[in-house]
Structure formats: C-alpha cells, structure tokens
Amino acid sequence: MIIELAKNYGFCFGVKRAIKKAEQIKDAATIGPLIHNNEEISRLQKNFNVKTLENIKSLSNETKAIIRTHGITKQDLEELRKKDIEIFDATCPFVTKPQQICEQMSKEGYEIVIFGDENHPEVKGVKSYVNTKAYVVLDKKELQNIKLPSKIAVVSQTTKKPEHFMEIVNFLMLKAKEVRVFNTICDATFKNQDAIKELSLKSDVMVVVGGKNSANTKQLFLIAKTNCEDSYLIETEEELKKEWFLDKKHCGISAGASTPDWIIQKVIAKIENFGIN
C-alpha cells in the first residue's frame, strides 16, 4: 500500500509563530487553548510550564499571559491590560486582520456580516470589534429574513471554504447598495484544502490528523470524505485501526494547521507497522 502525504498540510505560519513564542516565554498561562491540539498543549505544559486557563477570571498568581492564536475579545483584552501581568500576543496576524477591518468599517458606518461559526473563539473575537451591528452566519438562508442595511462589509472566519464565502457575498450583492468584501480566509487554508482535495480523489483511504475541535481540521475531513468514502479523522496514532487499510492500495494523509510533525510521523509509522502490502 502506498502512503502519501498531501502537498500542503500541518502547522501553519500562525501556529508555528505561537508555539515558538510559548517555548521562548515559558512559565506562562494562555487564555483558552493556545491552539486546537490537545497533544501539543500537553507537551507545552509538560516541557515549558505553559498552562491553559479557561478565561481571564482564572488568573491568580501568574506573571505572564499569552493570548491564543484565535485571539480574544476586545473586552477581555481591555480587562487583561488592567491586571498586573505581562502580556504576550500570539494572535495569528490573519486573525488580527478581520478584527481591524471590522473595527474600521463599523466606524465608517457599515454593518458587518461575518461568515463563520458564532461559537468559535476567533469569530467571538472578531465580532467584539464591531461598533455597529454584526450578523454571524454560516449560510445565506440565515440572511433572508433580515432587513439588511444599505452599507455592508463582509469578512470570513479564516478557515472557511472560499466557495461558501462567495455564496454569502453573491447573496449580499443582490440585497445591498454597497457591499465591501474582504478576503480574510488564510492562504494556508486555501493550500491545505486544495491539496487534500487532490489527494483524496486518488486515494481509497484517507486519514486526517488533528484536533477534533479544530475548525480547519474538520473542513479538511469534510473535503476528504466527499471524495473518499473511507476517510477517518484522528487526533493520535492510538485511534488507528488495521482493518481500515485492508485491501487498500493508496492511503492519503493530511493534517490540520495545529498538528505538529511529531504526531504525523507517529501516525505514518503505525500505519507502516500494520504491514499492509
């Protein structure tokens, strides 16, 4: 059986940057998980004493706080700045961009449409920078019964599929006099999604490695599943089952943006150890 890695996969720029910061800073607390990968979070805590707190209220004797890659709300940032604590911002620049856009556009009188998951920490943070009105949607149908203003700015969660974002944009173009469109989808998302689409079309089994609470990993899995019925989403090599690979000729592997290479290599090694010819 051939085992093939996607052309683009794994750690993105923003995650690499955040991990490096955390390793250098040490002995700190992150407000929410730094990234969406439990294994890497555990490694940071064990080796660098970087612990994860649920929220700002959980801070007690910590002297250093790291802002997660997904960012935090404007209100939480203001509260954090009032505390006697050193702040290190590991927010991905691709996430900071829609925050800045929303703040500026709402100052100019635009209402904001955010294409994304309202419960995702990134979207919560972006929405908090809107000073007018914000509509968070996952489907254009959610906009049909809303009385939309004449001036709209639209942004996307960084990990969403571009074609779905364009469905929202096309709908808004027919409804509002002025629509400002900002492409806030991360280019790593484009590359990883294109790569897994290509690989899944020629594979008869796919393994996607990443946190099951990771939005970009779930998107990769959905693309794989669309093209390859026998697709599996796992966090570690412990979840692999030999029967998945019996009678298979081509195994494709991809990984979410928060998945470190050391986990991916463990997955590959275990599949090889199954001895499927």
Curated annotation (Swiss-Prot):
Catalytic center residues: E122 (proton donor)
Binding site for dimethylallyl diphosphate: H36, H70, H120, S214, N216, S258
Cited NCBIfam families: ispH_lytB (TIGR00216), PRK01045.1-1 (NF002187)
PANTHER family registered for this protein in UniProt: 4-HYDROXY-3-METHYLBUT-2-ENYL DIPHOSPHATE REDUCTASE
Its EC number(s): 1.17.7.4
Molecular-function GO terms, alphabetical: 4 iron, 4 sulfur cluster binding; 4-hydroxy-3-methylbut-2-enyl diphosphate reductase activity; metal ion binding
Protein family: Belongs to the IspH family.
Cross-referenced Pfam families: LYTB (PF02401)
Residues engaged in binding (2E)-4-hydroxy-3-methylbut-2-enyl diphosphate: H36, H70, H120, T158, S214, N216, S258
Keywords from the named record: 4Fe-4S, Iron, Iron-sulfur, Isoprene biosynthesis, Metal-binding, Oxidoreductase
Catalytic activity: isopentenyl diphosphate + 2 oxidized [2Fe-2S]-[ferredoxin] + H2O = (2E)-4-hydroxy-3-methylbut-2-enyl diphosphate + 2 reduced [2Fe-2S]-[ferredoxin] + 2 H(+); dimethylallyl diphosphate + 2 oxidized [2Fe-2S]-[ferredoxin] + H2O = (2E)-4-hydroxy-3-methylbut-2-enyl diphosphate + 2 reduced [2Fe-2S]-[ferredoxin] + 2 H(+)
Gene coding for it: ispH
Keyword Iron-sulfur: yes
Name by which UniProt lists this protein: 4-hydroxy-3-methylbut-2-enyl diphosphate reductase
Essential cofactor(s): [4Fe-4S] cluster
Free-text function comment from the UniProt entry: Catalyzes the conversion of 1-hydroxy-2-methyl-2-(E)-butenyl 4-diphosphate (HMBPP) into a mixture of isopentenyl diphosphate (IPP) and dimethylallyl diphosphate (DMAPP). Acts in the terminal step of the DOXP/MEP pathway for isoprenoid precursor biosynthesis.
Annotated residues for binding of [4Fe-4S] cluster: C12, C92, C186
Residues where isopentenyl diphosphate binds: H36, H70, H120, S214, N216, S258
One GO term of the biological process aspect: isopentenyl diphosphate biosynthetic process, methylerythritol 4-phosphate pathway
Species: Campylobacter jejuni subsp. doylei (strain ATCC BAA-1458 / RM4099 / 269.97)
Pathway annotation: Isoprenoid biosynthesis; dimethylallyl diphosphate biosynthesis; dimethylallyl diphosphate from (2E)-4-hydroxy-3-methylbutenyl diphosphate: step 1/1; Isoprenoid biosynthesis; isopentenyl diphosphate biosynthesis via DXP pathway; isopentenyl diphosphate from 1-deoxy-D-xylulose 5-phosphate: step 6/6
Cofactor, free-text remark: Binds 1 [4Fe-4S] cluster per subunit.
